[in-house]
Structure formats: C-alpha cells, structure tokens
Amino acid sequence: MNVNIVDLNAVDAQRLVTESLIESGFAVVKNHKIPVSELNALYVDWDNFFCNGNPGQYVTDAESQAGYFSPLFAETAKGHEAQDLKEYFHYWPGGVLPGSVEKLTLRYYDAMFSLGKDVMV
C-alpha cells in the first residue's frame, strides 16, 4: 500500500489529501501547525499513565467504546488466528479521561480536530 505524503503548504493540499484518502484510506501530512513537542509531551503523559497509573479503573464503556482496552481482552482480526495483543485508550468528546493526561489530551484533540476541518473543508 502506498500512502502519499501531502505538504499542507501546497496550493492543492486539500485535493491531494482527498486523493490519498480515496486511494488508501490514509493521509500523511507535513507542515501542519501542531508542534512535535506537543505530541512528544502527550506520549510521555500517556506512557506514564500506562506504566504507573491504574488503567483498569477506566475500562471500556461497551456502548460508546471509549476508555481503556486491555490486552487481556484483545481482539482477533478477521482471517487471523493470533490475538492482536495491545492496550490502548479510546477517547471521544464527553468521555472520561484520567486526570494525569486530560489537559494535554484535550488540547491535542482540539488541535487535530481543527487541522482536520482545515484540510477537509
């Protein structure tokens, strides 16, 4: 699969993102305005949460699919025999976030949502 890298400073950036999404379902963008330092800080916060926090108290809500997904309940992808052993946390607006990651997560969510609107409008 080939995923194009789209420069958001390009005159036709919106068209290129759309084409990439149609072709592969993904778009990789560069020259967005979200600082890498903010993403790195977010990784540090979430790493601390998974290593030192209590993720089990944020177990996934079955209806919204928001919250903590444990590797103990890993899914098996269609056509595969082995489970996909990973842990992660889904967040949706209005969902619960651990206090230690809330501030940066919400700020990053807002920045990414704004970026998406700018690119797709």
Regions from the language model: what does each represent?
Residues 1-121:
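Peripheral, non-catalytic segments flanking oxidoreductase cores
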